[in-house]
């Protein structure tokens, strides 16, 4: 499908990641360039930022995500990469890293381009990543924000275009669990909304693309991008729940242990927990653990908490996650058994056997040489004695 202003969520993500890397700061002042106005339509959404205007990165993020200013997307792109083209390359690279296989960016703001497209699933992926950043959550969850006066403008007041958060643009759609994220409308993409909501520890994202207004029975207009998003989120909270699918302190396998007089095996357990949002009626017994031990047998000593393998949890072919398996107790080494094993290994070593064989051969040769030498000495001694006796006659 064609992208619209949901593109700006990816733009905001890359800006936030640049801040995390220390390449930018929220308070850093940016001077608006003339090139930031490139490729913008005259009737597109704007914050009326002018070339030469000086404004902070944080205020630009509000301009980007509340009034959906197209020029703010280009200004921030230049702040991160120096030029818009390099930033677009970074957008596509990040999309691939996040697993967005059906997405290609051709600009920073979402205005129509034949080479600019995505899927609802991909939008969910990069929106989920964006919402991990405090600054983005703060901005998209704000109903109204005042950008302070700049060198070229009086203060600007902007209202969130997301009717799930604010009645300013459209009445009757506020949803008390909503926390964002971004509206978007172009003639080609239709009316779109990426929304997110939180209920307790459960967090859901809904994506509506290409919605068209409908007329209610009373003649009023139903903006489906908002009403259907709320319906989806409420359905999600009714039918899904945050579930812990692996408990710590439950041994799941044993590893054999040698060189110890205290124990001949040690139990292993998963460390940490895996939590997923799962259907409320899902049979957790159907989740399959796959145990992978580094070794079936290890030598003592073993330390409590020592990583001995991994456990992967899978349901219907989907991998939920992997946990380390650690030893539940320590197992001390027997020094007697250890020394005996060293001696056994010494004599079992093929190199040692060759050396011992060579030593044995040398010893046999030396012994034979000694025997021959002694035999010759006796012979010479006997011959000498016989000669002396004959000389007296």
Feature locations, PLM:
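Active-site-adjacent loops and short helices of periplasmic peptidoglycan-processing enzymes
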Residues: 1-134, 139
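Domain-terminus/edge residues, biased toward the C-terminal soluble/receptor-binding domains
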Residues: 100-104, 114-117, 121-382, 392
